[in-house]
């Protein structure tokens, strides 16, 4: 049996397990537990035990100069790294810190993954000191979007995450919520939303008091050169979905065509959002995302990522921000 198969769990199966567990216990069963201290080198230093890590450039930028004029721009933190290795180390530290804070507060850490190069950027979590320090048993893992293909298919975000991250860390199988790939795109999206609702009822997933949508602890997003995030593509009607938590598309401009995706109200209700964007091919979309000249009629999906609470943190490299004149 492959590593992926050994830890496989559909959202429906995992939800059922959670439901049975909670039938004799209140939702408050997910409670804060004593926080295991992270090594001091993890929280107080920018130096990896293996190699020096250069601090990133911190900026809040717009093409016309540092600093945006809107409230949304003020909630963007732009981190720029000289090398991908430094970005990966910083992203691991950021994720580990948020995990520790969530576990200390609620006894669980809910995180949503994307596909693409994001998983490679998370690889440091599988190494010391993060592998030992993070309370993996408290993690609950979701997918921001997924292709409706078998779990062992080359296009599966589940397979990508399993191969690069999840098979290398001790997260309980019942807390890894894959889609049911035997269903249609619509059926898989509906079932995934039902799963989320069950986990909200069980007290595993919080609800935003501001939006009424699920409030995951961390939403980890990538971005395509066209400015798409999740499976929310420019000009597609699902971009404007504001009632459903999880939706679907059958006509993705990138293969495979059938996918499920979190909607913007769910994405933007997260406690924390990280956008991991690298490469010169994405510089145009980054430039537009930080532009003060925006109208609602031509927004790229990445421009619609706007947290209701907290700060949106961009993890970038210099090629990705090369069109920002203030950098």
From Swiss-Prot:
E.C. designation(s): 3.1.1.31
Keyword Chloroplast: yes
Superkingdom in the source lineage: Eukaryota
Catalytic activity: 6-phospho-D-glucono-1,5-lactone + H2O = 6-phospho-D-gluconate + H(+)
Alphabetical UniProt keywords: Chloroplast, Hydrolase, Plastid, Transit peptide
InterPro entries: 6-phosphogluconolactonase_DevB, Glc/Gal-6P_isomerase, NagB/RpiA_transferase-like, PGLS
Region listing for Disordered, in residue ranges: 1-66
Family matches, as CDD domains: 6PGL
Molecular function terms, GO-annotated: 6-phosphogluconolactonase activity
Pathway membership: Carbohydrate degradation; pentose phosphate pathway; D-ribulose 5-phosphate from D-glucose 6-phosphate (oxidative stage): step 2/3
Biased composition (Low complexity): 1-29, 43-66
Record GO biological process: carbohydrate metabolic process; pentose-phosphate shunt, oxidative branch
Stored Pfam families: Glucosamine_iso
Location(s) in or outside the cell: Plastid, Chloroplast
Enzyme class: hydrolase
GO cellular component, as recorded: chloroplast; cytosol
Signal peptide extent: none
Transit peptide, from-to: 1-71
Main location: plastid
Stated role: Hydrolysis of 6-phosphogluconolactone to 6-phosphogluconate.
Similarity comment: family membership: Belongs to the glucosamine/galactosamine-6-phosphate isomerase family. 6-phosphogluconolactonase subfamily.
Protein name: Probable 6-phosphogluconolactonase 3, chloroplastic
Organism: Oryza sativa subsp. japonica
